[in-house]
Amino acid sequence: KQPMEIINDILIPALDQAGTLYEQNKLFLPQLMQCAETSKRAFALLKEHFASDAPQKGVVMMATVEGDIHDIGKNIVKVVVESYGYRVIDLGKDVKAEDVVAAFRRHHPQAIGLSALMTTTLPSMEKTIRLLREEPNICPIWVGGAVLSEEYAKEIHADHYTADAMATVDLLERIL
């Protein structure tokens, strides 16, 4: 199988199933964390098989917002986006709004993606977007995560919402 087939046909469905089992209290936090760690290793191995000599399509920056330590979704999106030829500046998880702004000034990405898994961190996402909007020449901002929707993205003044990794690739293909 090709790396993208492994990601789309095996890893993403397995992570989705682990999340569902966790929500049903059939899988517990240690097992969920083990799934996350295993998937990170698998993604790292698969990343080695992507064409590194392909022309770069653009530079994007991604972060999981302050207060949120769940970055599995962001990491999946990152690997898929990189596999399509984009360079991703990954700021990590639990990233303060001010740090996202500083990174924007330093790296000048063509788009910024923000992720949140918990409703309690949505105010952090809103603050991050508000501070980014104060920057001259701000690039498009997209948001994603289990607790987000198209409506909420509009409410917090994000330019775009993406539901999954392939939707993110489709968006980047359109806007960059």
Residue ranges and their predicted role:
Residues K1-L176:
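Domain-level signal for soluble alpha/beta catalytic cores
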